């Protein structure tokens, strides 16, 4: 497994998006993982509709702007037979009624894989599969006001996960400062152009390996 990987440099990752005042991080994490897998399969990077997931995946257990899980989103896409493009079904940051149109579907999946809850397993998946959906504890002001460097907060929990994000790579600075490259959905103004480097191999810091998964296409 390589010592560093960055899928943003290989065309797998769309520009940073902004979820706004809606608890839809799970939808952004899910589209991010599927955008990467569709690019891997087709060589085309197409931005996918979070709004489609917000509006339509309640039967799978999601709650729109009140939260959800990436695996439920992948399950919806499988059962629905597709997911519309961002362009055809733009983001509104609010709960609206399902307006899925199969003719605008830009992706589908056959299910999902849950990665074993270890950073080594996550590292292997990121290296071999592509961007991976993960959930983290992002409930600290240190995270909300993050700007640069490797994020580490001793109060971060590996169990109380409240935010879905996308691991797009990993790397290291110096001898032992290892990090995950994480795409957030709080717009490009947040953090480092919308990204955060999160401490890696520090006892599953912030729970990054606790609920990691990706869709199969």
Swiss-Prot record:
Zn(2+) 3 binds at residues 71, 114. Its EC number is 3.4.22.15. Zn(2+) 4 binds at residue 92. Pfam families: Peptidase_C1 (PF00112). The keyword Protease applies. GO terms for biological process: antigen processing and presentation of peptide antigen; CD4-positive, alpha-beta T cell lineage commitment; collagen catabolic process; elastin catabolic process; enkephalin processing; protein autoprocessing; zymogen activation. It comes from the Eukaryota. PROSITE patterns: THIOL_PROTEASE_ASN (PS00640), THIOL_PROTEASE_CYS (PS00139), THIOL_PROTEASE_HIS (PS00639). GO terms for molecular function: cysteine-type endopeptidase activity; endopeptidase activity; metal ion binding. It is found in: Lysosome; Apical cell membrane; Cytoplasmic vesicle, Secretory vesicle, Chromaffin granule; Secreted, Extracellular space. CDD domains: Peptidase_C1A (cd02248). Zn(2+) 7 binds at residue 162. GO terms for cellular component: apical plasma membrane; chromaffin granule; extracellular space; lysosome. During export along the endocytic pathway, pro-CTSL undergoes several proteolytic cleavages to generate the CTSL single-chain and two-chain mature forms, composed of a heavy chain linked to a light chain by disulfide bonds. Autocleavage; produces the single-chain CTSL after cleavage of the propeptide. The cleavage can be intermolecular. Zn(2+) 2 binds at residues 50, 86. The keyword Cell membrane applies. It is an enzyme of class 3 (hydrolase). Inhibited by the propeptide produced by autocleavage. Long isoform of CD74/Ii chain stabilizes the conformation of mature CTSL by binding to its active site and serving as a chaperone to help maintain a pool of mature enzyme in endocytic compartments and extracellular space of APCs. IFNG enhances the conversion into the CTSL mature and active form. Inhibited by CST6. Inhibited by the glycopeptide antibiotic teicoplanin. Inhibited by amantadine. The active site is at residues 25, 163, 184. Disulfide bonds join 22-65, 156-206. It catalyses: Specificity close to that of papain. As compared to cathepsin B, cathepsin L exhibits higher activity toward protein substrates, but has little activity on Z-Arg-Arg-NHMec, and no peptidyl-dipeptidase activity. Zn(2+) 5 binds at residues 137, 140. Keywords: Cell membrane, Cytoplasmic vesicle, Disulfide bond, Hydrolase, Lysosome, Membrane, Metal-binding, Protease, Secreted, Thiol protease, Zinc. Zn(2+) 6 binds at residue 160. Dimer of a heavy and a light chain linked by disulfide bonds. Interacts with Long isoform of CD74/Ii chain; the interaction stabilizes the conformation of mature CTSL. This is Procathepsin L. It comes from Ovis aries (Sheep). The lineage of its organism: Eukaryota, Metazoa, Chordata, Craniata, Vertebrata. The gene is CTSL.
């Amino acid at each position: 497994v390589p010592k560093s990987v960055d899928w943003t440099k290989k065309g797998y990752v769309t520009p940073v998006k902004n979820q706004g005042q809606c608890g839809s991080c799970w939808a952004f994490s899910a589209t991010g993982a599927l955008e990467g897998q569709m690019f891997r399969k087709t060589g085309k990077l197409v931005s996918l509709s979070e709004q489609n997931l917000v509006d339509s995946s309640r039967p799978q257990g999601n709650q729109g702007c009140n939260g959800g899980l990436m695996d439920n989103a992948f399950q919806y896409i499988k059962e629905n037979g597709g997911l519309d493009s961002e362009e055809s079904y733009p983001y509104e940051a609010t709960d609206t009624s399902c307006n899925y149109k199969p003719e605008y579907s830009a992706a589908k999946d056959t299910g999902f894989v849950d990665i074993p809850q270890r950073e080594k397993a996550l590292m292997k998946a990121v290296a071999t599969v592509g961007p991976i959906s993960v959930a983290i504890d992002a409930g600290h002001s240190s995270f909300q006001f993050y700007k640069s460097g490797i994020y580490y907060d001793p109060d971060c929990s590996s169990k109380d996960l409240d935010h879905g994000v996308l691991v797009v790579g990993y790397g290291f600075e110096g001898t032992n400062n290892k990090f995950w490259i994480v795409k957030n959905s709080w717009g490009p103004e947040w953090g480092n152009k919308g990204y955060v480097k999160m401490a890696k191999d520090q006892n599953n810091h912030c729970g990054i390996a606790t609920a990691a998964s990706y869709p199969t296409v």
